[in-house]
């Protein structure tokens, strides 16, 4: 099922085509809807305010995949001949399927803060990008944050940290890093898998009640997150020792648990909830004109903002390519160059209407950018997230060698000769 959300009459020769693999339906629709609305609204904003990107109108087409990998791949195969500017897979499972396909089709693939971590090695994965940061890097920032809270990294020795994770490619992604860090810092790691969709967690939390780990870190998704918070409250596990990853830190994850979620924390790579110049423009050019994809009251939510960010990066890559190559509608190779030469400075964030966001720099070798991580805390009475940390640097000295080893293995298995970045 496809639905053109942003339509105009420009001919194919003078329009930027963008495809959206969305999940407004299915088990994860409560997360998929705000995400998809952010996707659509940003492109509507560019068309309404700027006449598109570089004066070229954008045509956006959603393909509803219901968070189903097989359907998402079918969507991709059906729409790839339109040459989408940037393919955004919207799930780790889909990312793994599309990495080899997009490389053959010469279409850039961006999985923002999810997907295959070792795809950060641009010499092996020239068509794939996973900036601003990855699950492995996030895991190092979480352990740094916990260590600092305990009074120093040496205080982790002898402590127990549980990882409650969605039993999927996504949920397992942080485990190798957490194991390496457990050896490095001497904490005991409990690995507790939760099967899809995550409504049955009694056995998991019974183990936590027995073992009483010092901290619980969660890589959850959808209903798994709110269920976990309710189960933690039921065994009186302290919320100030329970930290979610950035897919376990949206309003949808905490609101169903009510007052019990108060004090719960999560990682994030952006702030939410604030009025920004970008939000003001979205209201003025999109919602005030009756062209919004959703409810204007929800444009401050975590997942909506993440949807916006996906298309901010995709369209910045298109803009980079237009300027560098002197073209109106860049090719896949040219947009790939635009992603690989992405450098979003403080001044760029001001221009984009999101002042205060951290700088991002992508290179030929590094498709992740090593972006630092923020932590936020939920206030159940105010129903809002508050950022409570500075930007926490990631341990690149730990994760980059792991990424390079995994990428080298992938290259050997797939007969890929790593390119020379010069």
Where are these regions (language model features)?
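C-terminal segment of classical bacterial N-terminal signal peptides
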Residues: 1-9
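Beta-alpha junction/loop-to-helix N-cap segments that form part of ligand/metal-binding clefts
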Residues: 14-17, 30-37, 49-122, 131, ...
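Extracytoplasmic "Venus flytrap"
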Residues: 16-40, 64-70, 91, 164-173, ...
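Venus flytrap/periplasmic-binding-protein-like
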Residues: 65, 109-111, 115-120, 197, ...
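Extracellular/periplasmic Venus flytrap/periplasmic-binding protein
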Residues: 71, 118, 126-236, 273-280
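Periplasmic-binding protein-like
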Residues: 79-92, 110-112, 160-165, 212-222, ...
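Extracellular/periplasmic periplasmic-binding protein-like sensory domains
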Residues: 232-311, 406, 417-418
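Segments of small-molecule ligand-sensing domains
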Residues: 293-304, 315-388, 394
């Amino acid at each position: 099922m496809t639905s053109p959300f942003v339509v105009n009459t420009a001919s194919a020769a003078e329009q930027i085509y963008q495809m959206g693999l969305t999940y407004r339906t299915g088990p994860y629709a409560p997360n998929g809807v705000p995400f998809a609305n952010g996707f659509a609204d940003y492109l509507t904003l560019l068309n309404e305010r700027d006449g598109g990107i570089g004066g070229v109108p954008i045509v956006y087409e959603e393909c509803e995949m219901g968070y189903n990998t097989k359907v998402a791949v079918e969507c991709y195969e059906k729409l790839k001949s339109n040459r989408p500017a940037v393919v955004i897979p919207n799930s780790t499972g889909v990312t793994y399927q599309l990495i080899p396909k997009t490389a053959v089709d010469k279409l850039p693939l961006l999985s923002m803060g999810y997907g295959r971590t070792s795809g950060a090695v641009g010499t092996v994965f020239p068509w794939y990008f996973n900036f601003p940061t990855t699950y492995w890097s996030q895991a190092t920032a979480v352990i740094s944050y916990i260590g600092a809270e305990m009074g120093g990294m040496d205080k982790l020795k002898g402590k127990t940290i549980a990882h409650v994770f969605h039993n999927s490619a996504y949920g397992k992604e942080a485990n190798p890093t957490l194991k390496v860090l457990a050896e490095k810092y001497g904490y005991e790691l409990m690995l507790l898998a939760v099967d899809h969709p995550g409504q049955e967690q009694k056995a998991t939390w019974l183990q936590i009640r027995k073992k009483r780990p010092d901290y619980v870190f969660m890589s959850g998704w959808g209903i798994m997150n709110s269920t976990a918070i309710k189960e933690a409250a039921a065994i009186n596990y302290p919320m100030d020792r329970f930290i979610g990853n950035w897919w376990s830190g949206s309003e949808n994850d905490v609101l169903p648990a009510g007052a019990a979620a108060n004090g719960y924390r999560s990682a994030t790579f952006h702030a939410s909830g604030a009025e920004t110049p970008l939000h003001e423009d979205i209201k003025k050019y999109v919602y005030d004109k009756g062209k919004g994809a959703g409810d204007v009251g929800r444009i401050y939510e975590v997942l909506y903002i993440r949807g916006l960010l996906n298309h901010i990066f995709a369209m910045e890559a298109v803009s980079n390519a237009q300027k560098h190559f002197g073209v109106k509608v860049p090719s896949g190779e040219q947009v790939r160059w635009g992603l690989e030469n992405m450098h979003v400075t403080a001044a760029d964030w001001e221009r984009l209407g999101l002042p205060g966001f951290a700088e991002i720099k992508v290179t030929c070798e590094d498709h992740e950018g090593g972006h630092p991580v923020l932590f936020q805390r939920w206030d159940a009475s105010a129903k809002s997230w508050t950022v409570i940390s500075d930007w926490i640097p990631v341990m690149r000295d730990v994760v980059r060698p792991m990424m390079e080893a995994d990428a080298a293995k992938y290259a050997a298995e797939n007969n890929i000769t790593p390119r020379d970045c010069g």
